[in-house]
């Protein structure tokens, strides 16, 4: 068996060690054909089929590893990336990196929340109030943009308890369903930042073989994401209804038209649609004369 630790010049990728983002990254790499030998007890993993090394770290360490050129690529939430960037710029440090693409997972929002019984109309109601947060720089930027002075209270966890504990009047924290806020007697009042995961690269040029591998990975990621947003549609259509049926299909440009072996009045139509095909549209297609309608998922795409 080949010893992967002896391979030189591997592409180094930093990923979050635990949590939902870690799971989504593992799924994405698998979909891109990267075979990783994962071991939960080890902080470094290796690809079996490509010269790739995975560093499994805390999510808030990933931006710094990219900024400092320690790793070549990283997948990180945009909220964590921008918070770290703003913090470094506030300290007059130079920050350089390349953002290659946004990914289709890691959705979250950074929101302001207050006690459910508080009267709130807009952000100016928080003037001179104390706000607890784990994202002081994103919060400060938002409040400055709105011309509101406030007092920041930095908490690295359990931010939701701050109002009930008398630590702060309001909080600024990540929200998904809002269930945690509700459980702590809070209500979401303003979204200040929306985030997804993104793929970033260190600013320093990579050697040609590494950059070629980055380009290959990026192409595969884009193909996986495009496929996830697309459907392959097959149907039979009367020749005289082709124009009408094509107009009903969302996101379709040039369908493939094929003759049917034993039917000269109809043809087979194959199309890739980059929009969802709802039941209502399928019913409209049937009313227009289409039959044998199949809608299939697409695993991979390359244009």
UniProtKB/Swiss-Prot annotation:
Its cofactor is Mg(2+). This is ATP phosphoribosyltransferase. Belongs to the ATP phosphoribosyltransferase family. Long subfamily. Feedback inhibited by histidine. The gene is hisG. PROSITE patterns: ATP_P_PHORIBOSYLTR. It catalyses: 1-(5-phospho-beta-D-ribosyl)-ATP + diphosphate = 5-phospho-alpha-D-ribose 1-diphosphate + ATP. It is found in: Cytoplasm. HAMAP family: HisG_Long (MF_00079). Its main location: cytoplasm. GO terms for biological process: L-histidine biosynthetic process. GO terms for molecular function: ATP binding; ATP phosphoribosyltransferase activity; magnesium ion binding. Pfam families: HisG, HisG_C. Its EC number is 2.4.2.17.
């Amino acid at each position: 068996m080949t010893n992967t630790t002896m391979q030189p010049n591997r592409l180094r990728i930093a990923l979050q060690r635990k949590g939902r983002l870690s799971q989504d990254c593992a799924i994405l790499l698998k979909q891109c054909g990267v075979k990783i030998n994962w071991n939960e007890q080890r902080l470094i993993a290796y690809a079996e089929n490509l010269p790739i090394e995975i560093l499994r770290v805390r999510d808030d360490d990933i931006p710094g590893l990219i900024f400092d050129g320690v790793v070549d690529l990283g997948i990180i939430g945009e909220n964590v990336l921008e918070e770290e960037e703003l913090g470094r710029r506030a300290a007059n440090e130079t920050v350089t990196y390349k953002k290659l693409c946004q990914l289709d997972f890691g959705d979250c929002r950074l929101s302001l929340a207050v006690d459910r019984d508080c009267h709130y109309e807009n952000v100016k109601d928080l003037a001179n109030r104390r706000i607890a947060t784990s994202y002081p720089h994103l919060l400060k930027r938002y409040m400055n943009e709105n011309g509101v002075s406030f007092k920041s209270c930095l908490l690295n966890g359990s931010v939701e308890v701050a109002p009930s504990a008398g630590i702060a009047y309001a909080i600024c924290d990540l929200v998904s369903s809002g269930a945690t806020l509700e459980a702590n007697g809070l209500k979401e009042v303003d979204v200040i930042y929306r985030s997804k995961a993104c793929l970033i690269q260190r600013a320093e040029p990579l050697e040609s073989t590494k950059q070629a591998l980055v380009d290959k990975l990026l192409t595969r990621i884009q193909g996986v994401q495009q496929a996830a947003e697309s459907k392959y549609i097959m149907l039979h259509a009367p020749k005289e209804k082709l124009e009408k049926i094509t107009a009903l299909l969302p996101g379709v440009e040039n369908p493939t038209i094929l003759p049917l072996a034993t039917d000269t009045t109809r043809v087979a139509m194959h199309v890739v649609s980059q929009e969802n095909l709802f039941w209502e549209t399928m019913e409209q297609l049937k009313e227009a004369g289409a039959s044998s309608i199949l809608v299939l998922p697409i695993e991979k795409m390359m244009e």
